[in-house]
């Protein structure tokens, strides 16, 4: 099992949690981004840079992931593709996307997109706070405990 991170939009505090977990649990974490970013020296943490462009990083993640891998993303269409390929997706606020909930979440996202396109001001998500960081860390720990078998 590997962890893939849609890193361009991933909050720094979430990356820090992932870096600590990578070393503690000895799980491979790969950040996929369209620009270079600093990562700590670790045999478990990698950076894969891709060219700029719409969904280039997303497409690379879907191409590289294997069934059972975990993807960290707030991108709901990407999460849906990951699940369709047999992977798992966790957003930076600690919500695990599953086969059971992804379609309704995707439908709500599309509805809100339609609302915004018609001029309705919907606002964006609030900044990630302590409770979201804790929810993310807890969900990540549960997932890794259940699914990762260190070699």
Swiss-Prot record:
Q: Where is the signal peptide?
A: none
What Pfam family does this protein match (any one)?
Answer: DUF188
Tell me the InterPro entries matching this sequence: UPF0178
Q: What family does this chain come from, according to its entry?
A: Belongs to the UPF0178 family.
Q: Please give the PANTHER family that the UniProt record associates with this protein.
A: UPF0178 PROTEIN YAII (PTHR35146:SF1)
NCBIfam families in the record, alphabetically? PRK00124.1 (NF001095)
This one is known as UPF0178 protein Spea_2958
The record lists the organism as Shewanella pealeana (strain ATCC 700345 / ANG-SQ1)
